[in-house]
Amino acid sequence: MANTKDARVTIALECTSCIQRKTSGKSAGLCRYTTRKNRRNTPARLELEKYCFHCHKHTLHKESKK
């Protein structure tokens, strides 16, 4: 059986540009990616450059709070 305290967890990455535009009311949506990370190797929040299909460019995506 699978261990409940598994080192790998599923996380969501959200576009930081869309979050900033969302507060001003001009956002067409919010770009989210899902991925898995190992908590033992990467204990800090994950930040990656990913393509945002709402901004139409590569932007910084940060791990969201759950």
Swiss-Prot record:
It is found in: Plastid, Chloroplast. This is Large ribosomal subunit protein bL33c. NCBIfam families: PRK00504.1 (NF001764), PRK00595.1 (NF001860), rpmG_bact (TIGR01023). GO terms for cellular component: chloroplast; ribonucleoprotein complex; ribosome. GO terms for molecular function: structural constituent of ribosome. Pfam families: Ribosomal_L33. GO terms for biological process: translation. Keywords: Chloroplast, Plastid, Ribonucleoprotein, Ribosomal protein. The lineage of its organism: Eukaryota, Viridiplantae, Streptophyta, Embryophyta, Tracheophyta. Its main location: plastid. PROSITE patterns: RIBOSOMAL_L33. The keyword Ribosomal protein applies. Belongs to the bacterial ribosomal protein bL33 family.
